[in-house]
A protein has these predicted regions:
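Hydrophobic ligand-binding cavity/cleft-lining segments
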Residues: 1-38
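Charge-dense, helix-prone N-terminal extensions
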Residues: 4, 16, 47-48, 57-61, ...
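Hydrophobic residues in beta-strands and at strand termini
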Residues: 7, 11, 49-51, 90
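Short, hydrophobic/aromatic-enriched beta-strand segments in well-ordered soluble domains
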Residues: 9, 101-103
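Hydrophobic pocket/interface hotspot
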Residues: 18, 28, 47, 62, ...
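A conserved amphipathic terminal alpha-helix motif
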Residues: 105-138
Length: 138
Protein backbone atom coordinates (compact mmCIF):
# COMPACT_ATOMS: atom_id res chain seq x y z
CA UNK A 1 0.00 0.00 0.00
CA UNK A 2 1.25 3.45 -0.93
CA UNK A 3 0.84 5.93 1.89
CA UNK A 4 1.24 9.53 0.68
CA UNK A 5 3.94 11.64 2.29
CA UNK A 6 2.50 14.86 3.74
CA UNK A 7 4.26 17.88 5.20
CA UNK A 8 2.81 21.24 6.24
CA UNK A 9 4.64 24.45 7.04
CA UNK A 10 3.45 27.93 7.96
CA UNK A 11 5.44 30.83 6.53
CA UNK A 12 5.54 34.41 7.73
CA UNK A 13 4.79 35.60 4.20
CA UNK A 14 1.68 36.52 2.21
CA UNK A 15 0.18 33.89 -0.06
CA UNK A 16 1.15 35.85 -3.21
CA UNK A 17 4.83 35.73 -2.25
CA UNK A 18 4.68 31.98 -1.58
CA UNK A 19 2.90 31.38 -4.90
CA UNK A 20 5.61 33.31 -6.73
CA UNK A 21 8.28 31.23 -4.99
CA UNK A 22 6.51 28.08 -6.24
CA UNK A 23 5.96 29.21 -9.83
CA UNK A 24 8.71 31.64 -10.86
CA UNK A 25 11.71 29.75 -12.27
CA UNK A 26 14.31 32.22 -10.98
CA UNK A 27 12.81 32.16 -7.49
CA UNK A 28 12.47 28.34 -7.55
CA UNK A 29 16.18 28.02 -8.31
CA UNK A 30 17.00 29.80 -5.05
CA UNK A 31 15.26 27.32 -2.74
CA UNK A 32 14.12 24.26 -4.74
CA UNK A 33 16.47 22.98 -7.45
CA UNK A 34 19.21 25.38 -8.61
CA UNK A 35 19.79 23.34 -11.78
CA UNK A 36 16.23 24.00 -13.03
CA UNK A 37 16.56 25.48 -16.52
CA UNK A 38 12.93 26.27 -17.30
CA UNK A 39 9.52 26.16 -15.70
CA UNK A 40 6.04 27.43 -16.51
CA UNK A 41 2.98 26.93 -14.27
CA UNK A 42 0.92 25.66 -17.20
CA UNK A 43 -0.83 22.27 -17.33
CA UNK A 44 1.13 19.95 -19.60
CA UNK A 45 4.42 21.84 -19.30
CA UNK A 46 7.28 19.31 -19.13
CA UNK A 47 10.65 19.89 -17.55
CA UNK A 48 13.60 17.74 -16.57
CA UNK A 49 16.93 17.99 -14.82
CA UNK A 50 19.62 15.97 -13.10
CA UNK A 51 20.92 16.66 -9.60
CA UNK A 52 24.59 17.57 -9.46
CA UNK A 53 26.68 14.41 -9.34
CA UNK A 54 23.70 12.14 -10.05
CA UNK A 55 22.76 10.07 -13.07
CA UNK A 56 19.07 9.99 -12.11
CA UNK A 57 17.27 12.36 -14.50
CA UNK A 58 14.02 13.71 -13.04
CA UNK A 59 11.18 14.19 -15.52
CA UNK A 60 8.25 16.29 -14.37
CA UNK A 61 5.03 17.48 -15.96
CA UNK A 62 2.64 20.08 -14.55
CA UNK A 63 -0.70 18.34 -13.94
CA UNK A 64 -2.75 20.95 -12.07
CA UNK A 65 -2.73 24.71 -11.59
CA UNK A 66 -5.19 26.71 -9.51
CA UNK A 67 -3.75 30.21 -9.61
CA UNK A 68 -2.50 31.29 -6.21
CA UNK A 69 -3.74 28.11 -4.50
CA UNK A 70 -2.58 24.79 -5.94
CA UNK A 71 0.21 23.44 -8.15
CA UNK A 72 0.84 19.78 -8.94
CA UNK A 73 3.35 17.96 -11.10
CA UNK A 74 4.21 14.38 -11.90
CA UNK A 75 7.62 13.09 -10.81
CA UNK A 76 9.26 10.27 -12.77
CA UNK A 77 12.82 9.21 -13.53
CA UNK A 78 14.11 8.61 -17.05
CA UNK A 79 14.79 4.90 -17.67
CA UNK A 80 13.29 3.83 -14.32
CA UNK A 81 9.81 2.49 -13.56
CA UNK A 82 7.45 4.32 -11.27
CA UNK A 83 5.48 7.53 -11.26
CA UNK A 84 4.59 9.87 -8.43
CA UNK A 85 2.87 13.22 -8.04
CA UNK A 86 3.71 16.25 -5.92
CA UNK A 87 0.95 18.69 -4.93
CA UNK A 88 1.54 22.08 -3.30
CA UNK A 89 -1.56 23.64 -1.71
CA UNK A 90 -1.61 27.14 -0.18
CA UNK A 91 -3.91 28.45 2.55
CA UNK A 92 -4.08 32.01 3.90
CA UNK A 93 -3.79 32.29 7.66
CA UNK A 94 -4.00 36.00 8.38
CA UNK A 95 -0.75 37.56 7.14
CA UNK A 96 0.86 34.13 6.96
CA UNK A 97 0.57 31.21 4.55
CA UNK A 98 0.28 27.51 5.26
CA UNK A 99 1.71 25.22 2.62
CA UNK A 100 0.58 21.61 2.45
CA UNK A 101 2.74 19.33 0.30
CA UNK A 102 1.55 15.85 -0.61
CA UNK A 103 3.77 13.38 -2.49
CA UNK A 104 1.93 10.28 -3.71
CA UNK A 105 3.14 7.22 -5.61
CA UNK A 106 6.46 6.75 -3.81
CA UNK A 107 5.96 2.98 -3.54
CA UNK A 108 5.90 2.73 -7.35
CA UNK A 109 9.64 3.43 -7.60
CA UNK A 110 12.30 0.66 -7.58
CA UNK A 111 13.63 -0.68 -4.28
CA UNK A 112 17.03 0.90 -5.03
CA UNK A 113 18.19 3.00 -2.02
CA UNK A 114 18.10 6.14 -4.19
CA UNK A 115 14.31 5.80 -4.35
CA UNK A 116 13.78 5.00 -0.66
CA UNK A 117 10.81 6.77 0.90
CA UNK A 118 13.07 8.07 3.68
CA UNK A 119 15.17 9.98 1.11
CA UNK A 120 12.07 11.74 -0.17
CA UNK A 121 10.84 12.49 3.36
CA UNK A 122 14.21 13.92 4.42
CA UNK A 123 14.46 15.89 1.20
CA UNK A 124 11.03 17.46 1.57
CA UNK A 125 11.66 18.33 5.22
CA UNK A 126 14.81 20.19 4.14
CA UNK A 127 13.22 21.82 1.11
CA UNK A 128 9.89 22.86 2.69
CA UNK A 129 10.88 23.21 6.35
CA UNK A 130 14.20 24.95 5.85
CA UNK A 131 15.07 26.08 2.29
CA UNK A 132 11.72 27.65 1.40
CA UNK A 133 11.21 29.02 4.90
CA UNK A 134 14.61 30.74 4.83
CA UNK A 135 14.00 32.05 1.31
CA UNK A 136 10.60 33.55 2.21
CA UNK A 137 11.39 34.90 5.67
CA UNK A 138 14.94 36.26 5.31
Amino acid sequence: MDTPFLIEQVYDAPIEKVWQALTDKDKMKKWYFPQLKKFEPVIGFRFEFTDDGSHYKKEWQVTRVEEGRKLAHSWTYKDYPGSSEVTFELFEEGNKTRLKLTHTGLASFPTDPHFARRRFEDGWKQIIGSNLKNYLEN
